[in-house]
UniProtKB/Swiss-Prot annotation:
Belongs to the ATPase delta chain family. One of its GO terms (molecular function) is proton-transporting ATP synthase activity, rotational mechanism. InterPro entries: ATP_synth_OSCP/delta_N_sf (IPR026015), ATPase_OSCP/dsu (IPR000711). F-type ATPases have 2 components, F(1) - the catalytic core - and F(0) - the membrane proton channel. F(1) has five subunits: alpha(3), beta(3), gamma(1), delta(1), epsilon(1). F(0) has three main subunits: a(1), b(2) and c(10-14). The alpha and beta chains form an alternating ring which encloses part of the gamma chain. F(1) is attached to F(0) by a central stalk formed by the gamma and epsilon chains, while a peripheral stalk is formed by the delta and b chains. Disulfide bonds: none annotated. F(1)F(0) ATP synthase produces ATP from ADP in the presence of a proton or sodium gradient. F-type ATPases consist of two structural domains, F(1) containing the extramembraneous catalytic core and F(0) containing the membrane proton channel, linked together by a central stalk and a peripheral stalk. During catalysis, ATP synthesis in the catalytic domain of F(1) is coupled via a rotary mechanism of the central stalk subunits to proton translocation. Its main location: membrane. This is ATP synthase subunit delta. It is a peripheral membrane protein.
Length: 180
């Protein structure tokens, strides 16, 4: 089974447990925090990945981290389970999948809006409102400036891309002219 499929299984189960406990958001924050720690600290990742360190040593390190970060018992149990099964390296994917499932559960989408020039707050709000109206979900928009677009905007929602950039329009015109 692929690591992505494994990550999704753990994430889906944890979202269900979090939903029952009313802790979806706090679990998400804890997972994100621990995952970032694991990703940012090469030494920590090396300890958990190195078979020379016994499982007891790894458990002690994990217990100390859980205590310092004041993680909930549910997240603590998940981390110990991943450690026992040799899957702690999958935690970043679990965290990412958890975030996606949690957003789906709460009716949130997180599109990315790229524009050739910086947009004014009123323009961003207008786009956010239009996306919320068309999707029926709460929109948390990530705005980026990409000068290569020349002008216009590109919106990415999940796997879909809505490209209204000048760069793409020019490429289409060039393609039409070349084909004659």
């Amino acid at each position: 089974m692929s690591t992505n499929a494994i990550a999704k299984r753990y994430a889906k189960a944890l979202v269900q447990l979090g939903s029952e406990a009313g802790s979806v958001d706090s679990f998400n924050a804890e997972l994100t925090r621990f995952s970032a720690l694991l990703t940012d600290s090469r030494d920590l990742s090396a300890v958990f990945a190195n078979p020379a360190y016994g499982i007891e040593s790894k458990r002690e390190v994990m217990k100390e981290l859980v205590a310092k970060l004041q993680l909930s018992p549910m997240i603590s149990n998940l981390l110990m389970l991943l450690l026992e099964r040799g899957r702690i390296s999958v935690l970043p994917q679990i965290s990412e999948s958890y975030g996606a499932f949690a957003d789906e559960l709460s009716g949130v989408i997180r599109p990315t809006l790229s524009s050739g020039l910086p947009l004014e707050a009123s323009q961003i709000e207008e786009i956010r409102s239009a996306l919320a109206k068309s999707t029926g979900k709460k929109v948390e928009l990530k705005v980026e400036v990409d000068p290569s677009l020349i002008g216009g905007v590109v919106t990415k929602i999940g796997g879909k891309v809505f490209d209204g950039s000048v760069r793409t329009q020019l490429a289409r015109i060039q393609d039409i002219l070349q084909k004659g």
